[in-house]
Amino acid sequence: MILSPSLSLPSCASSCSSSQSQFNFKSKSLSLNRKRSVPHKLRNLKCAPTENTPVTRKLDSQSNMTISLHRDEDEENPPPLLDSETTTRPRRIALFVEPSPFSYVSGYKNRFQNFIKCLREMGDEVMVVTTHEGVPEEFYGAKLIGSRSFPCPWYQKVPLSLALSPRIISEVARFKPDIIHASSPGIMVFGALIIAKLLCVPIVMSYHTHVPVYIPRYTFAWLVKPMWMIIKFLHTAADLTLVPSAAIARDLLAAQAAAANKIRLWNKGVDSDSFNPRFRCHEMRVRLSNGEPEKPLIVHVGRLGVEKSLDFLKSVMDRLPEARIAFVGDGPYRQDLEKMFAGTRAVFTGMLGGEELSQAYASGDVFIMPSESETLGLVVLEAMSSGLPVVAARAGGIPDIIPAEQEGKTGYLYTPGDIEDCMAQLMPLLNDRELRERIGKLAREEMEKYDWKAATKKIRNEQYSAAIWFWRKKRSQFLRPFQWLAKRIFPSPELNL
């Protein structure tokens, strides 16, 4: 595959179809490998792939991004229509998830729990290998295996595990997976990769935590480059990479961490029944507002970590003496935040779940998200599904949830770190009940389009099938020299006739 910095393409009679929607890249010229590079400005193009014309890769996103790639024999894509028998028959899927989606507080907790649930409802056999703490005895019939873990050196509350003990290798081998799916980055993904190679099984990696962005906040900035090298090693070894947002896809491409035709979007999903305006509750509002339910109430839900830029909210609240703020969630930064907000009317509820969490979302006036490092921002989806207007930083995966054409309709975005811009978006909502209700209603309607079952079906049927196709192609290319040699050593009898 060859990419040129400036493309002038002939018109095409037909357009190539893809299950992915468009990204609009605006980045400098990048090299994806020795044979290809990403142009500094890629245009939205539709063309039928031929021998000499480019292939247009599309990734599902509300932001328009198109990767225009010249096709050669080494960079083909799977056929758009796959054998229905292979996509509908039950599959055996081994998931390697670190930290545990059952106990660790993070954005992907709901994603993986719903994913496992939906896979089981589709009739698939699922094995989950994860860190040992908090692993339940049963979860929708999936086979659960805990691997002994240790705390991350610079983030003690994050458990890590290689998951490469003889016991786990034996368990996975007996399970006979059709495909292995590992969360990335981390330590366990290395174990998953080794096991996939040992068992000759395709491996999909899904990228969930943008570690290079977090590193300067927790440890030494010089570790960013080595971290990107590790990510590149992992994802170039994977048969397919799943990302939660277009922004993360752009970052991986910019770092040459994966080939463009092997990056696919894991569609967003939200449980619109659990996160619903009907859960609005006066008692919960009294609790969140510190006994003053008549005051404007701002809600933030999520893990309380230093990388979430939550100190920015102190500057916001200093300008809103009449408003109240509630932090729903827990994390290593909680004590610092409590000291920071000492003497104010801020409320820290700790972890909430189930109906209490649904009530917390639905009982606020505005949801605020200052984080600049979200790979997607599932709490933003949950807030919008609850009918809560959102004000969030225009960074990370958030613009994929509230794209430019939807700003002011389904939510508001502000320039990261810009207090004036944030206040300009926040104040009208706090002062105008009708505006809050209108934005909340439109946000709810938008979120009703996204369903976990549909997102899971797309991964299972389309993306897993694509990974298997890439794996088989790579395997056949690897075996080709040996097949050629075998023909020379053991010539076919028919050829001698």
Where on the chain are the PLM-derived regions?
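A short, active-site helix/loop in glycosyltransferases that binds the activated sugar's phosphate group
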Residues: 228, 236-265, 270-274, 336
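A short, well-ordered alpha-helix in the C-terminal region of glycosyltransferases
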Residues: 421, 435-449
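Nucleotide-activated donor-binding/catalytic signature segment of Leloir-type glycosyltransferases, i.e.
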Residues: 335-356
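Short hydrophobic beta-strand element within catalytic cores of glycosyltransferases
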Residues: 389-392
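N-terminal subdomain of nucleotide-sugar transferases
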Residues: 2-148, 452, 474-497
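Aromatic "clamp/platform" in nucleotide-sugar-dependent glycosyltransferases that forms part
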Residues: 372
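Short alpha-helical donor nucleotide-sugar binding micro-motif in glycosyltransferases
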Residues: 172, 351-352, 359-364
